[in-house]
UniProtKB/Swiss-Prot annotation:
KW Membrane (keyword) present: no
Cellular compartments per GO CC: cytosolic large ribosomal subunit
GO biological-process terms attached to the record: ribosomal large subunit assembly; translation
Any one Gene Ontology molecular-function term assigned to this protein's record: 5S rRNA binding
InterPro entries: Rbsml_uL18_euk
PANTHER family per UniProt: LARGE RIBOSOMAL SUBUNIT PROTEIN UL18, RIBOSOMAL PROTEIN L5-RELATED
Gene designation per UniProt: rpl18
Organism: Thermococcus kodakarensis (strain ATCC BAA-918 / JCM 12380 / KOD1) (Pyrococcus kodakaraensis (strain KOD1))
Protein name as it appears in the record: Large ribosomal subunit protein uL18
Amino acid sequence: MAHGPRYRVPFRRRREGKTNYHKRLKLLKSKKPRLVVRKTLNHHIAQIVVYDPKGDKTLVSAHTMELMRDFGWKGHGGNTPSAYLLGLLIGYKAKQAGIEEAILDIGLHPPTRGSSIFAVLKGAVDAGLNVPHSEEIYPEDYRINGEHIANYAKALKEEDEALYRKQFSGYLVKGLEPEKLPEHFEEVKAKIIEKFEGARE
């Protein structure tokens, strides 16, 4: 381990790989709410957060478990379609709470073009939340609606049905054929829009 009078011990959260303080400072200087997006192996989480000296305050939040519980989503919580739907949900929640704009905070996630993190961003923007961005970072539409998953499932079923049933058991046990994921995506998307757009009327 390095030592000496010029050696500085990094902040604990930086050592633990939880916070990039240089990036955080740049975000805080904007003085705007942050659209915080985080990804785990099986889920996505989104929050609208504002800075407070005593600790960040979460104004609204959404989790892919909500998609399953409240809107009947039967797909995986960690894929691109669920990320977009989560973005749509957090965007509508933010608008409902009177939040019109935010800046994206992806933490230590690498800013990979077309990643599911940016699918959350697209969903939030489509819901009407103003977030500075470049559309070039969005995933392609066929990935957002799950067409790539459906095509893979169709091909796998024809080639090896046993492997198909094993790999997509999570879908099948919920009564969803993965080949029909794009249609299911549109159904759940419509439910989210109806809940919030209908409430305005």
